[in-house]
Regions:
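Ubiquitin-like/PB1-type beta-grasp interaction modules and other compact soluble beta-rich domains
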Residues: 1-161
């Protein structure tokens, strides 16, 4: 499906930081008896902002054709918050988006009253504070296939491209 891989040379120190981030996530998950509890979930919408703390995320098996049962992905955070009655949401399946010829993923279309429109909508990132924004956590893996371990934070934010 026209996949491109890029390789970037990084320092040993950077690799050690990435490894430590993963080790911290494993430790956090173990300390929570195998549950994924995200210390900070942030939602910055067009009209509303939310900050939830210590959110337990459970598997919803949205992509059962892709993953084994009970694999937890980033989108499960939104589904778990909705299940807890803390927000409402809509998901939308996209075969493609704009010039991205092949997407085939669910996207968060709406959180409460903030609904995607035109070239504006929600994107997300998850990981350690050390790699916030474009330092590594913000990537282009759809949230329904981004497997999470136990990130320090997960953020959905509104963007117009």
């Amino acid at each position: 499906d026209k996949t491109t891989l890029s390789f970037v040379k990084v320092t040993e120190n950077y690799l050690n930081q990435v490894y430590q981030t993963y080790a911290d996530e494993v430790k956090r998950r173990n300390e929570n008896d195998g549950k994924i509890i995200i210390p900070n979930v942030i939602i910055k919408g067009k009209t509303e902002n939310f900050h939830f703390q210590n959110v337990e995320v459970t598997a919803h098996n949205l992509r059962a054709e892709m993953f084994q049962p009970d694999v937890i992905t980033a989108i499960d955070t939104i589904l778990s918050l909705g299940e807890a009655g803390l927000l409402s949401y809509d998901l939308q399946w996209y075969e493609s988006i704009g010039t991205a010829g092949l997407v085939k993923s669910y996207w968060v279309e709406r959180i409460n009253q903030d609904k995607s429109e035109g070239r504006c909508g929600f994107v997300y990132e998850a990981g350690d504070e050390l790699f916030r924004f474009f330092k590594g956590n913000h990537n282009h893996i759809p949230s329904d296939i981004r497997v999470i371990n136990s990130p320090a934070y997960l953020e959905y934010f509104w963007i117009c491209i």
